[in-house]
C-alpha cells in the first residue's frame, strides 16, 4: 500500500495525532477527578468543551488561508509544544475561568494550527482508491497511541495515590509526552521529502490564487462537511456514556477511568480498520459506508432509549454503549475520505480539509454544553434518554445528507470522465 518511507512518515503523523489531544480530552480518563479537583459540574465541563470548540471553529475557518501555505514542520511542532506548556499551567489548578481560557487556547494550538495540516499530510500519502484504508489505519494508529498514553497516565495517577497529587502527575505526564513529540516533529519532518500521491485534477497558477473561493463554491465539499457535522454531533454524546454508567448502572469509580479510555481510544483501534476496509474493499465508497452506518446508528439509539437500563447488568450496559461507540468510530475513521473519493484537486485539499473541519467539528461548540445541561436539569435516566433522542435525530439527518453526497460524487465522477473523453 505504502513505501517504507511513507510508512515511516505515516507513523510520525499518527504519533502526532495520537498525543496532541490528550490534554484537551482530559475528561476521557479523568472526568471524575476533573469534577472533584477543578470543582466543575457536568455543565461547566461541557462549557469548557464548547468554548474550545467555538475557538476551534473560528480557527478552522482561518486555517483555510494557510493550511496549504505554511511549512508543516513549524506549524505542527509549535502547536505540540505550546499544547504541552498549557498542560503545565493546568497543574497549578486554575479556577473555572482559567480552565475556560486554557481550553480556548487548545482550540488554537491543537485544531487551528495542527489538525487540517495533519489531515492533508495523511491524505497525500495515498491515491484516491486508498483514502478509506489510509484514514482507517490512521484512526487505528491514533487509537493505539491514545490507549497506551492514556492508560500510562492512569497508571501514573494511581501510582501517586489516585488523589490530587496523582491528578497533577497525570497532567504532567501528558504535557511532557506532547512536548517530546513536538521536538521530534521539528527535527525529523521534512516538507520537501513527500510528493502528493492522490490522483487528482491539477490546476494552473491562476486557479491556485482562488482555491479558497472555489472550495466555498463546491457543493460536494459542503456535503462532505455536513456529513462530518452529523457524525461529530453523535460522537459528542459518547462522552456522557461515562456518567451514564456511573449514575445509572453504578459502575465502580475504579472502572470509570478505564471505561473512558476504552470508550474514546480503544474503539479507534477496532473502528479504524473495519470502517476503512469495508468502505474501500466491500462498498468501494466511503460515502456509501457513512450512509449505511448513519441508518444503523439511528436504529441503535432508538433501541438504547427503549432498553430497561435500571434493571440490566452493568456489563451488558457497557457492552451496549461500547458497541454503539464502535459504530461511531468506524464513521470517524472515514468521514474525511470522501474528499479523496471525490477527487478534489490537490491544491485545494488543505482548504477543503479546513472547511470540512470548520463545519464538521462545529457541534462541539454546543453539543457538549447542551448534553451536559440536559443531564444537570433532568437527573436520572430521563436526562440520558433525552440526550440519546437528540443524538438519534442527528444520525437520521446524517443519513439524509449522505444519500445526497453519494449521488453528488457519482455525478461528479461522470462529469470528470466526460471531460476526459
Curated annotation (Swiss-Prot):
Pfam families in UniProt: MFS_1
InterPro entries tied to this protein: MFS, MFS_dom, MFS_trans_sf, OPA_Antiporter
Membrane topology according to the record: Multi-pass membrane protein
Periplasmic side: 1-44, 92-95, 168, 376-385
Spans within the Cytoplasmic topological domain: 66-73, 119-146, 190-220, 263-288, 331-354, 407-421
Keywords: Cell inner membrane, Cell membrane, Membrane, Transmembrane, Transmembrane helix, Transport
Conditions for induction: Down-regulated by cystine.
Annotated transmembrane regions: 45-65, 74-91, 96-118, 147-167, 169-189, 221-241, 242-262, 289-309, 310-330, 355-375, 386-406
Domain of life: Bacteria
Family: Belongs to the major facilitator superfamily.
Name this protein carries in UniProt: Inner membrane protein YihN
Organism: Escherichia coli (strain K12)
Gene name of this polypeptide: yihN
Amino acid at each position: 500500500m505504502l513505501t517504507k518511507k511513507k510508512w515511516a512518515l505515516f507513523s510520525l503523523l499518527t504519533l502526532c495525532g495520537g498525543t496532541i489531544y490528550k490534554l484537551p480530552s482530559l475528561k476521557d480518563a479523568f472526568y471524575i477527578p476533573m469534577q472533584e479537583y477543578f470543582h466543575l459540574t457536568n455543565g461547566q465541563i461541557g462549557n469548557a468543551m464548547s468554548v474550545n470548540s467555538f475557538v476551534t471553529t473560528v480557527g478552522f475557518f482561518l486555517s483555510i488561508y494557510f493550511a496549504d501555505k505554511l511549512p508543516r514542520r513549524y506549524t505542527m511542532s509549535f502547536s505540540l509544544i505550546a499544547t504541552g506548556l498549557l498542560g503545565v499551567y493546568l497543574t497549578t489548578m486554575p479556577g473555572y475561568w482559567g480552565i475556560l481560557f486554557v481550553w480556548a487556547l487548545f482550540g488554537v494550538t491543537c485544531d487551528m494550527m495542527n489538525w487540517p495540516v495533519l489531515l492533508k499530510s495523511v491524505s497525500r500519502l495515498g491515491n484516491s482508491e486508498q483514502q478509506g484504508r489510509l484514514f482507517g489505519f490512521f484512526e487505528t494508529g491514533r487509537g493505539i497511541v491514545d490507549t497506551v498514553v492514556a492508560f500510562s497516565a492512569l497508571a501514573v495517577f494511581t501510582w501517586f495515590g489516585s488523589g490530587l497529587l496523582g491528578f497533577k502527575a497525570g497532567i504532567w505526564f501528558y504535557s511532557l509526552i506532547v512536548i517530546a513529540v513536538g521536538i521530534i516533529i521539528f527535527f525529523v519532518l521534512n516538507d520537501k521529502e513527500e510528493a502528493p500521491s492522490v490522483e487528482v485534477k491539477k490546476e494552473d497558477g491562476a486557479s491556485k490564487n482562488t482555491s479558497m473561493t472555489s472550495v466555498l463554491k463546491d457543493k460536494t465539499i459542503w456535503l462532505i462537511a455536513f456529513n462530518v457535522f452529523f457524525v461529530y454531533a453523535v460522537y459528542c454524546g459518547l462522552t456522557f456514556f461515562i456518567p451514564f454508567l456511573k449514575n445509572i448502572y453504578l459502575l465502580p469509580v475504579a472502572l470509570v477511568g478505564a471505561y473512558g479510555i476504552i470508550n474514546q481510544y480503544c474503539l479507534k483501534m477496532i473502528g479504524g480498520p473495519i470502517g476503512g476496509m469495508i468502505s474501500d474493499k466491500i462498498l468501494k465508497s466511503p460515502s456509501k459506508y457513512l450512509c449505511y452506518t448513519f441508518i444503523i446508528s439511528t436504529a441503535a439509539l432508538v433501541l438504547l432509549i427503549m432498553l430497561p437500563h435500571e434493571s440490566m447488568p452493568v456489563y451488558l450496559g457497557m457492552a451496549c454503549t461500547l458497541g454503539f461507540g464502535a459504530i461511531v468510530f468506524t464513521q470517524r475513521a472515514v468521514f474525511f475520505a470522501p474528499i479523496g473519493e471525490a477527487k478534489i484537486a490537490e491544491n485545494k485539499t488543505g482548504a477543503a480539509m479546513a472547511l470540512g473541519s470548520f463545519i464538521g467539528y462545529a457541534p462541539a461548540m454546543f453539543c457538549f454544553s447542551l448534553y451536559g445541561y440536559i443531564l444537570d436539569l433532568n437527573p436520572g435516566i430521563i436526562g440520558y434518554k433525552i440526550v440519546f433522542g437528540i443524538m438519534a435525530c442527528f444520525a437520521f439527518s446524517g443519513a439524509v445528507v449522505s444519500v445526497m453526497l453519494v449521488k453528488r460524487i457519482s455525478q461528479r465522477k461522470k462529469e470528470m470522465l466526460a471531460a476526459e473523453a
